[in-house]
């Protein structure tokens, strides 16, 4: 397909890591991660394979993305983005999700991601527990107060 069909957005921005990126709505991000993870396209499958076989090169050795891809043995592909964005795809299933923390921070997006992945059945109970211990911990200065919306596309 022509480039304009794949990438209808023309405004370029820079992510936190400096990589050029397009401004797009969350439903488009989720759709793109579903396509990325689907296995229907050889080029995208190669990207997913590279990400899941070497997750530490995606975001560093101790990052959420690396831990999710490593602990799920490559069944989930994950990439954190700037301003509270988190995109995740179920490898081989053609399913994707995108999360946006309204305040632009990481505080909630990882906890939301772990919760959604558990609810969707994308994580085993053991992996879910391990990720929850690290990313869903409340302290005396934190509370679980749900704010925002959840839309399924």
Each predicted region: which residue ranges?
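Short, contiguous, pocket-lining structural segments
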Residues: 14-25, 39, 43
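Structured C-terminal helix/loop/strand segments within mature extracytoplasmic catalytic/sensor domains
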Residues: 34-153
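Single conserved hydrophobic/aromatic residue that forms the stacking wall/gate
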Residues: 1-11
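Sparse, context-dependent recognition of short Cys/His-centered cofactor- or disulfide-binding micro-motifs
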Residues: 7, 14, 72
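Hydrophobic (often cysteine-bearing) scaffold residues that line and stabilize catalytic clefts
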Residues: 4, 25, 109
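General structural signal for secondary-structure boundaries
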Residues: 7-8, 25, 124
């Amino acid at each position: 397909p022509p480039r304009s069909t794949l990438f209808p957005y023309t405004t370029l921005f820079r992510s936190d890591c400096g990589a050029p990126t397009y401004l797009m709505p969350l439903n488009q991000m989720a759709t793109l991660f579903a396509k990325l993870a689907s296995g229907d396209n050889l080029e995208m499958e190669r990207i997913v394979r590279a990400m899941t076989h070497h997750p530490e090169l995606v975001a560093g050795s101790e990052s959420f993305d690396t831990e999710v891809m490593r602990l799920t043995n490559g069944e989930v592909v994950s990439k954190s983005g700037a301003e509270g964005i988190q995109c995740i795809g179920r490898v081989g299933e053609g399913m994707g999700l995108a999360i946006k923390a309204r305040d632009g921070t990481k505080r909630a997006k990882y906890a939301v991601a772990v919760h959604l992945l558990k609810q969707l059945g994308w994580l085993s109970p053991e992996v879910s527990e391990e990720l929850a211990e690290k990313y869903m911990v409340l302290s005396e200065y934190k509370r679980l107060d749900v704010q925002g919306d959840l839309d399924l596309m």
